[in-house]
Swiss-Prot record:
Annotated Protein kinase domain residues: 29-319
Tissue occurrence: Isoform 1 and isoform 2 are expressed in various tumor cell lines. Expression of isoform 1 inversely correlates with ERBB2 in breast carcinomas (at protein level). Widely expressed. Highly expressed in fetal liver, skeletal muscle, pancreas, heart, peripheral blood leukocytes and testis.
The protein, known as: Serine/threonine-protein kinase VRK2
Transmembrane regions listed in the UniProt entry: 487-507
Enzyme Commission number(s) from the entry: 2.7.11.1
Residue numbers binding ATP: I35, G36, S37, G38, G39, F40, G41, L42, I43, K61
Source organism of this protein record: Homo sapiens (Human)
Gene Ontology cellular component terms for the protein in this record: cytoplasm; endoplasmic reticulum; endoplasmic reticulum membrane; mitochondrial membrane; nuclear envelope; nucleus; protein-containing complex
Amino acid sequence: MPPKRNEKYKLPIPFPEGKVLDDMEGNQWVLGKKIGSGGFGLIYLAFPTNKPEKDARHVVKVEYQENGPLFSELKFYQRVAKKDCIKKWIERKQLDYLGIPLFYGSGLTEFKGRSYRFMVMERLGIDLQKISGQNGTFKKSTVLQLGIRMLDVLEYIHENEYVHGDIKAANLLLGYKNPDQVYLADYGLSYRYCPNGNHKQYQENPRKGHNGTIEFTSLDAHKGVALSRRSDVEILGYCMLRWLCGKLPWEQNLKDPVAVQTAKTNLLDELPQSVLKWAPSGSSCCEIAQFLVCAHSLAYDEKPNYQALKKILNPHGIPLGPLDFSTKGQSINVHTPNSQKVDSQKAATKQVNKAHNRLIEKKVHSERSAESCATWKVQKEEKLIGLMNNEAAQESTRRRQKYQESQEPLNEVNSFPQKISYTQFPNSFYEPHQDFTSPDIFKKSRSPSWYKYTSTVSTGITDLESSTGLWPTISQFTLSEETNADVYYYRIIIPVLLMLVFLALFFL
């Protein structure tokens, strides 16, 4: 794993303004003034000598050559952040932009008898930590949009075999040329989780535990496990909860990593209520609770369903626009009646609980328990009979779901007499707000975001509004109808299973 954040690296001696650096491609860069420092290095404005600029559009990050973080970050940029690669991805995914800083070059230089490593990157603007509220919060619409933008970035870097490992507001920067855009920077803790297509194996190492920013780092990192894609998704979930609520359950114990790990474990084990109760006045954490349910259900080497996660944060697919703190963004304060907040939280708890229970029934959770899906399959191959029975059970579940979906949905609106209106952010999100009027509006509108749940087992979106449980109730699915369906199904499947059992015994 890459070096820990708490390892002590000395900052380099400041370079004089005007010093010329030669990168490995033969390009020359003139240093401007120092504009900041990271955890391990200094950052300068930079100007290419072949194209004079009045306003610097590049920066140079400088560290001692022996420092590990810049080396890790440099390898990431060399493999992942080339301009042509990002451009092709944007076209392929039909994005307006991708929030990864562009990489322009790197090299080594000498100064006062010491060797330094430097990297030239795109210049970015201010970080979100500096522009958040006094308690570090953002509007809910902004939080959800930031989550979607970060999922775009994570999907790209995960596809290129890397994880970030240190998502937080201080590492999210606005664009310099276009402050409507947000970028994920600082890849000093980036990790190649799947070199050459071979995913790292799950292995706990307490000596490497609690790596990253303790407030947001994942449970795997607490255990000393090499980071994987689920770590980034989990970290993003904690960040969104912090940005919306202004606090996290373990903030008073940040000096005790073990206590933080325990608090995170409790939060994930007690979803969704553990997240919903942190909702600020006049808002809710339904989307974030559902997001963390999905993150917690991922196996160690499982690929997240990025589109489904985006659907959780933006269920109506409304086009993204400027962030509300950018030059064009505007916002309107939303007031939600106290009674509505109570009803919404009860409904959200009910629906997310159903979704969570369904995940538990469909997936073996013995790992978070210690093994990835791939390792488990290799170490414990199922016998033929058990495999067939498992497939039959899954098919039966799918059949029951299809049958249930064909029934007319129950009208749950009687207990929630309301309609959905929206507070509009120009070219941005519409944030749901309940008005308590006619229930008829639900016949024309789509379901609120907290009625949607995405299973990581399948790529579809299940509408939980049309169901009062994971299985049909007596009013939806009578005993005779179920029996008839089962008889027809098992008349076919039982002979097939018996034949497979016979063949298996014959050849053993």
